[in-house]
Amino acid sequence: MYLTHIPSSSLRLTGPDRLDFLQGQMTAHLKAAPTPGRVPALFLSVKGQIEFFAQIYKRPDDLYLHLAAGQAEALERRFKKYIIFDQVEVQNVSSVLSTLHLWGEMGGEISLEVAQKLNYSPEEAETQITDVGEMTLLISRFNRTGQSGLEVHVLNKHLDALLELLALEEKPYSAVQEARVRAGISDPLEDGFLGDLPQECGLEGAVSYKKGCYIGQEIMARLEARGNTRHRLVRLEGQNLPSHLELEQGGKKVGQTGLSVGNVVLARLRKELEDGATLEVGSSSATVHDLSSTLNPSALRAF
């Protein structure tokens, strides 16, 4: 397996009302998750547009929110606008924690040797809290690259000891991003899809339609009932495709590209441009490939 440091920020929620409060803020059904457990979740505007994407970890004594680097402070400000009488405390723990992603095993299997070093049991719960010497680790089976890997959260003071224990080849974050794009997995921050609807950029799997009210829920329910979004997530294949470019056809805006890895880029594209269509992307030509049959549903699970 390979090891990659994930640029991160994070929040910790404590207090007796933490679960009810967070349940009303996000798209996933956190109350249905096991303890310990993890759900991917979106935080939407009242218009249903994506503001934040996070992995939410449910632990016995707190809730841990893992976000991309630089996102925690803004989400903390949002929370504090809504905390009135709720008994909830929000703590930014970005500076004390590190996150590693262990990935790249053939066939997507978890290395038993690595799992044993971490005291992680692959045949048991997806998310586990383990003790290794003086270290307490939060570990979850997690698909960032099209195959299952392990996401490991550790206190910074134990990071060097963990790296020495694992003794794995390190890969840069860009390698994880390239694998993600090729696997057709959307990342709203890296791909520039913040401000868009989840259903239009491959993130509907992070939306639960079984839970109660939350910010943006009315729009999500309306879209589920009518199914009338105008865009979908696709993969474009060509040569030297640019990142974060507005796409036009016949003088009309038809979508936007996400993060490019050269010959492949994900794009939010109007539905009338069907699978196999050819599209001009900057100075290059690209072919549209529908992702509806290739996206791995286990990459997102909102309960």
Region roles according to the model:
Residues 1-53, 57-60:
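Acidic, proline/glycine-enriched N-terminal capping motif
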Residues 2-5, 9-10, 55, 59-186:
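Acidic, low-complexity central loop/insert segments
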Residues 12-18, 31-32, 102-108, 236-243:
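Short, surface-exposed ligand-recognition loops at beta-strand->loop->(often short) alpha-helix junctions
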Residues 15, 65, 102-104, 152, ...:
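Residue-level signal for inorganic ion chemistry
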Residues 25-31, 79-84, 165-169, 224, ...:
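Short, solvent-exposed amphipathic alpha-helical segments in soluble enzyme
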Residues 39-53, 83-86, 131-139, 250-254:
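Short amphipathic beta-strand starts and helix->beta connectors
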Residues 145-233:
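Anionic-ligand-binding alpha/beta catalytic cores of soluble enzymes and soluble regulatory domains
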Residues 179, 201-207, 211-217, 221-303:
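Glycine-rich, small/acidic residue-mixed loop/short-helix segments
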